[in-house]
Swiss-Prot record:
Part of the 50S ribosomal subunit. The keyword Nucleotidyltransferase does not apply. SUPFAM superfamilies: Ribosomal protein L13. It comes from Dictyoglomus turgidum (strain DSM 6724 / Z-1310). This is Large ribosomal subunit protein uL13. CDD domains: Ribosomal_L13. Gene3D superfamilies: Ribosomal protein L13.
Length: 142
């Protein structure tokens, strides 16, 4: 029996909508990464993007356990000497709640061109509304 290799032309992509309200950030991000990568499908092939599109709503209501709201620090650097910037999770939620989920999922996907392609299929919105009704997304309970 030959090993099955999915071809990018044969892949049928679905759209899923996930409500992040009350969900723990890491657990939510790992499930989203699995769907973006395509590991939930029987046709999963590591070197082909077999994943589906994921829409995340209510990103502002995602939960951090313990004292991470004040103790978790996001680090950014401009590339210039002294160009580092630190921001806590509380400040990140106030400034850009979508970025918390984006960075968590990004860290769980492969690094390189294929991972960047997978990340483009992730759409995150702070509130309950999203502009992707035409794609008829399926509700996904995580």
């Amino acid at each position: 029996m030959k090993t099955f290799m999915a071809k990018k032309e044969e892949i049928k992509r679905e759209w899923y909508v996930v409500d992040a309200k009350g969900k723990v950030l890491g657990r939510l991000a790992s499930e989203i990464a699995k769907i973006l990568r395509g590991k939930h499908k029987p046709i999963y092939t590591p070197h082909v993007d077999t994943g589906d599109f994921v829409i995340v709503v209510n990103a502002k209501d995602v939960v951090l356990t313990g004292k991470k709201e004040d103790q978790k620090i996001y680090f950014f650097h401009s590339g210039y000497p002294g160009g580092h910037r630190l921001i806590t999770a509380r400040d990140m939620r106030a400034k850009s709640p979508e970025k918390m989920i984006y960075l968590a999922v990004k860290g769980m996907l492969p690094k390189g061109p294929l991972g960047r392609k997978m990340l483009k299929k992730l759409k995150i919105y702070a509130g309950p509304e999203h502009p992707h009704q035409a794609q008829k997304p399926k509700e996904l309970n995580i």
